């Protein structure tokens, strides 16, 4: 069974995750992390958990300054995504990437609404509606970022470009080379916008949001969708495939869209609850609770090896893996224990993230713990601290519960392995140190 899976399924999965599209999404979405993390720092400061501090920030006029940074970083996440994905795709094709990113950005702006209606019914035109440059435009940004670059690269590969004489600066040459593909792409975007606007009184990005993004977000936010996501990552890891890359490449756009939708509810002054449209499954749901201490939540495994292991091999591995695990890095354990391709650890490794998913989903669904806004904590931030920074002491306590559960889930399996290793070590003949003298 295992051999057939490795021969038939693994090559297909590897081929999928190595496609230019998936690689572009993975690399492109990472570009949004820096501004989102910086924005999250300002968001934490602006909504400091001590009321006296918030009062001082408001009275001194500092809070609006902090909020300005939050709005600027969170509100352009879709724009960053479309540029990042397009840039990454063109780079993989060995074509000039910056022009590709700019053309994709222009395409995205053409396809999105350029007006808003005020509460009084007045239509204000000629604006960039930040509703669509953040979470609601995320899937549209991904789609544009996957469609524009292949067209752009096709023109350049076929040498359909304006050629400049030798000696012209490279930047000027690249700009003129992009003119023909840019004209074709932006004209096509204008035609699509005209059809949507004149024929259906809407825009391309709005159609994508209603037809594609909303159903996908609902599916992702369901318990079944969450369990499937949490199962897939460690399942692939078990067979040596980087499951986090696969899940991240497919799910990051949707998870970030859910996070930004939650933040929009907070910014509107409404309480962030499920009843008010809040989402349970967000980027933080996955990063800070399902992938805590690494894929498979292996901290329980490492804690046993560090404190209780009797065999020399596991003791040494525990010492090697404890510090990296605290910062979310568990490759030493995955390949050292090993967890990968080890049938004795398959059940806890694949099952623990699913258990954590069920615990967290229940805590958020029932309101025991608060839903998450757009605050992004680096995945390398140690547990408990990351939970507190994310949503206060309740989230920190939830992380602690998951860490404790991890220990008991792994315990019977690693004890058995430890006992087997100990017997094997005792049965190994001791080499005579003076043998070679």
Spell out what each predicted region is:
Residues 2-16, 55-63, 121-122, 263, ...:
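Transmembrane alpha-helical segments and their short flanking loops
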Residues 14, 18-162, 340, 360:
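Early transmembrane hairpin of solute transport permeases
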Residues 20, 24-46, 139-142, 146-147, ...:
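Core transmembrane alpha-helical segments of multi-pass membrane transporters/permeases
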Residues 21-22, 26, 165-177, 212-216, ...:
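Membrane-interface segments at loop-to-transmembrane junctions
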Residues 46-69, 106-136, 165-170, 199-218, ...:
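Inter-helical loop and helix-membrane interface segments of multi-pass membrane transporters/permeases
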Residues 78, 82, 86, 103, ...:
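Alpha-helical transmembrane segments in multi-pass membrane proteins
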Residues 184-308:
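Generic multipass alpha-helical transmembrane bundles of integral membrane proteins
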């Amino acid at each position: 069974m295992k051999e057939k899976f490795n021969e038939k399924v693994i090559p297909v999965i590897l081929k999928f995750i190595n496609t230019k599209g998936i690689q572009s999404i993975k690399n492109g979405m990472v570009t949004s992390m820096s501004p989102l993390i910086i924005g999250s720092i300002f968001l934490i400061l602006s909504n400091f958990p001590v009321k006296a501090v918030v009062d001082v920030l408001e009275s001194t006029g500092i809070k609006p300054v902090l909020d300005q940074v939050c709005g600027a970083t969170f509100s352009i996440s879709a724009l960053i995504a479309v540029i990042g994905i397009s840039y990454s795709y063109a780079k993989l094709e060995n074509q000039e990437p910056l022009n590709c990113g700019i053309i994709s950005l222009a395409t995205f702006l053409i396809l999105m609404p350029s007006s808003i209606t005020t509460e009084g019914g007045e239509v204000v035109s000629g604006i960039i509606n930040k509703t669509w440059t953040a979470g609601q435009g995320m899937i549209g940004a991904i789609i544009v970022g996957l469609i524009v670059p292949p067209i752009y690269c096709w023109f350049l590969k076929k040498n359909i470009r304006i050629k400049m004489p030798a000696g012209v600066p490279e930047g000027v040459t690249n700009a003129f080379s992009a003119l023909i593909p840019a004209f074709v792409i932006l004209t096509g975007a204008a035609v699509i916008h005209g059809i949507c606007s004149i024929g259906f009184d809407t825009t391309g990005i709005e159609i994508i949001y209603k037809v594609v993004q909303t159903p996908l977000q609902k599916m992702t936010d369901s318990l079944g969708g969450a369990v499937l996501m949490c199962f897939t990552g460690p399942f692939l890891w078990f067979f040596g495939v980087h499951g986090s890359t696969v899940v991240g490449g497919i799910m990051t756009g949707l998870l970030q869209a859910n996070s930004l939708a939650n933040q929009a509810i907070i910014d509107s002054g409404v309480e962030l609850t499920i009843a008010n449209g809040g989402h349970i499954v967000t980027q933080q749901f996955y990063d800070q609770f399902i992938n805590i201490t690494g894929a498979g939540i292996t901290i329980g495994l490492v804690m046993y090896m560090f404190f209780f292991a009797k065999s020399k091999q596991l003791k040494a591995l525990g010492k090697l893996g404890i510090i990296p695990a605290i910062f979310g890095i568990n490759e030493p354990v995955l390949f050292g224990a090993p967890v990968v391709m080890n049938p004795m650890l398959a059940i806890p490794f694949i099952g623990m993230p699913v258990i954590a998913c069920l615990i967290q989903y229940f805590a958020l669904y029932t309101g025991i713990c608060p839903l998450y806004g757009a605050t992004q904590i680096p995945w390398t931030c140690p547990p408990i601290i990351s939970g507190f920074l994310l949503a206060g002491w309740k989230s920190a306590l939830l992380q602690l519960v998951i860490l404790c559960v991890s220990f008991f889930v792994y315990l019977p399996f690693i004890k058995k392995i430890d006992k087997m290793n100990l017997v094997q070590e005792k049965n190994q003949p001791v080499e005579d140190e003076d043998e070679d003298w």
